[in-house]
Amino acid sequence: MRILIAVQACLLILGRGSSVADAMADFDGWENVVVYPGDFPRTYDYEDEAGVVHRLDEPIAGESWYGGPVLLSWPAVEAGYDESGMALVIHEFAHKIDMLDGTVDGIPPLAGAARESFRREV
């Protein structure tokens, strides 16, 4: 279980930094990965066009919390790539790397010209 999650997570940091230690720094400060035996409930509130607030309970396979853990469903981890082509571990850990600079904007922490180049290409 741990190896499968770790290998997929490490795919995200291949080529980052000038050394393995630099690349692994992307994972500094992360404390927990919680693995559930199946999908798990997520409760959230949303407001519709009329201003009415609704509460929904929705089963999900993964979630990343800013300043918190990565939550994963083991069957989804084992599946690796489902019919949608999404690898859950890579998807959730990409969110965590995006959060490293304090801005959750879909862009990983990059310096100067690399950040601008990334913005232009996306």
Model-predicted regions and their roles:
Residues 1-2, 83, 115:
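Generic detection of long, well-ordered alpha-helical segments
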